Amino acid sequence: MIMFGKVIVSLVWVVWIVIVGSTAEGQNVSPEYIPTYSTTYDRVKARGYVICGTNDEFPGFSQEMILGGGGEERWEGFDVDLCRAIAAGIFGDPDAIEFEIVNGKTRFEFLLDGTIDVLSAATTYTYTRNVQKKLEFMPTTYYDGQGFIVRKTLGVSSAKQMEGARICFSSSGTAAKNIKDFFKKHEINYIPVSVPPNQKTKNVYKRGDCDMYGTDRSGLASNRLSFSDPDRHLILPEVISKEPLGMVVRYGDQKWSDIVRWTVYALFIAEEIGLNSNNIDRFENNNDPNIQRFMGELNGNDHPHLGSKLGLGANWSYNIIKLVGNYREIYERNVGVNTPIGLKRGLNKLYTHGGLLYAPPLK
């Protein structure tokens, strides 16, 4: 009886720890979204589509386009395709998705209150956002850095020449602190022009209310496309910060974060092993076990298909690549050198080509 009593006490203690721990971890998440197994995935499956939060009017990354003469609207861009990849893996349909426009203020609010399932809006992974805001950052999909854009009429070639300049930036991002640190380090005086998140900083710059505009360099290149005179604006050479950008999900929902995380890794792995949307069907019944695992062809008790561990079908990763493409395809068609935005891959190459993109083994 004494031993039995100890067992009961131990079980109660374990349950209490689990409950308290779960509450502490999810303290900034609406109680409705504290998962038993994966509340987000269950809700997504029940409704039949993913809700993705993204920016609007962000050429190359996320923008609602009018297609053809029929006036059909369709979201396009790098961040948009990342969300489509999630839908393709879950439903076998990249269009099983709804896009919710977010800004610097609402993006985290919408994620934490359950308005959106995943945030794909050029969001920088930082310590504070991860630890304090209880956000789960997915693998970095775009390695960036903050820079500056100016009018060529100023005749400058470096941010260090901008003594006394008016510099505009969004009040809701990482730009303000980066700019403060940079100009303090170089002992340069400047006039900060903080733009609230419900306004677009690029419009404040275009109106002439500031001399220089600071944000991620990919954002500068994208926003310059929307200017009526893009050739009259210069992106300066300085890169003043690290800005690892990627998708974000709610903290504490392990199954959902695993699905989104391995969706990103599937894009990297497919490029690494040579699979793309055009050739993937030719790799059926291939002798390479790595390709067999990716195609969902290893079955049986010893080698169950890997999708089963996520609650997905055997062909989840095949569908991602067949229907959306690998990382290289997504990058090149949206922001690559042959697009209007014209961004070289740089750090956003696979590690095998000198970049920072690297996925754990799919095994």
Report the location of each language-model feature.
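Bacterial N-terminal signal peptides
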Residues: S10-V20
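Acidic, polar ligand-binding/catalytic clefts
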Residues: V80, R84, A88, G92-Q161, ...
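Short, hydrophobic alpha-helical packing/hinge segments within bilobed ligand-binding/sensory domains
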Residues: T40, L82-C83, T106-L111, N198-Y205, ...
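Hydrophobic residues within well-ordered alpha-helices
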Residues: I86, L111-L112, M162, V204-G208, ...
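Bilobed "Venus flytrap"/periplasmic-binding protein-like clamshell domains
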Residues: I51-G60, E72-I90, T124-T126, D144-K200
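Extended ligand-binding regions for polar small-molecule ligands
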Residues: N28-P35, Y41, K152-V156, K160, ...
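Extracytoplasmic small-molecule ligand-binding "clamshell" domains
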Residues: N28-S120, L312, L323
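Boundary at the C-terminal end of the N-terminal hydrophobic targeting segment
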Residues: A24-G26
